[in-house]
Each structure stands twice: as structure tokens, then as C-alpha cells.
């Protein structure tokens, strides 16, 4: 049976503690079952789809994940459309898509890094305020100024 040996077990630097003795640092690469003669490699299961994470069986998480992916693809397709055909409809579509994309992304940051009921409620309220102000600002910019498409074109032209 093959074995994986750490480098620290090969280098002896004087006295080593009990937990770091060479005999405790040798770990088997393959695990052998007592009932069978064949050995099985240790493997990790990698989940690539959101359906493996939906523990309650509801479709809300899957639909949300699908919506995020559709929005990401829509943003990818809006970039060339905004460059070749700038119009108010594309400006407002970009404003809505960018705001929603940012809202969902920052919502995941809040979910991952904010702990405690009161802190989560405050962070979500702040996120809603930020998303609302962002969308209102982009709509104001589209209505009273040149719009998102022409503004980016002006940045590239200078």
C-alpha cells in the first residue's frame, strides 16, 4: 500500500514533540477495507450545482441562482449593445441590471460575513438604501445628463 510521507518526518532536528514524531506523520494515501482486498482512494465530493445546497427542497434558491446567471448573461450581452446602439432604453436597462447585480452580490457578502440578528437587519436595510440610491442616481444621470452609454464612450474618447 502506498503511503504519503511529510517532509518534516524525513528531517530530524533534535528532539521532536510527541505529536510530531515521524511515526505520527506518516498518513496512508489509500484506505483499505477489511472485507475486501481492493483499496479505494480517498476522494472529496465537489458540488457544482445549487440543487445540492437547497436543503429544504424549495425552488426559491434554485430560481434565485438561475436569475443571477440570467442577469449575468444579460449584462454580457448589454455591453456590446450599449457600444454599438446607445439609446435611453439601453441606458435604463443597464441601470437596472447593474443595480440588481450589485445588490445580489453585496447581499451575498452580508449573508457570509455579518452575524447576529440585529446586525443582519441593519446591514440588509443599509443594502436596500444603497441599492435604491444607486438606481435613483443612475436614472437621474440617464434623464438629466448624457446617459451611461454616452458617458462611457466619452471616457474612452479622451
Swiss-Prot record:
Keywords: Electron transport, Heme, Iron, Membrane, Metal-binding, Mitochondrion, Mitochondrion inner membrane, Transit peptide, Transmembrane, Transmembrane helix, Transport, Tricarboxylic acid cycle. SUPFAM superfamilies: Fumarate reductase respiratory complex transmembrane subunits. Residues 30-62, 111-119 are mitochondrial matrix. It holds the Pfam family CybS. Heme b binds at residue 101. It is a multi-pass membrane protein. One of its GO terms (cellular component) is mitochondrial inner membrane. The chain crosses the membrane at residues 63-84, 90-110, 120-141. Component of complex II composed of four subunits: the flavoprotein (FP) SDHA, iron-sulfur protein (IP) SDHB, and a cytochrome b560 composed of SDHC and SDHD. Membrane-anchoring subunit of succinate dehydrogenase (SDH) that is involved in complex II of the mitochondrial electron transport chain and is responsible for transferring electrons from succinate to ubiquinone (coenzyme Q). SDH also oxidizes malate to the non-canonical enol form of oxaloacetate, enol-oxaloacetate. Enol-oxaloacetate, which is a potent inhibitor of the succinate dehydrogenase activity, is further isomerized into keto-oxaloacetate. This is Succinate dehydrogenase [ubiquinone] cytochrome b small subunit B, mitochondrial. The gene is sdhdb.
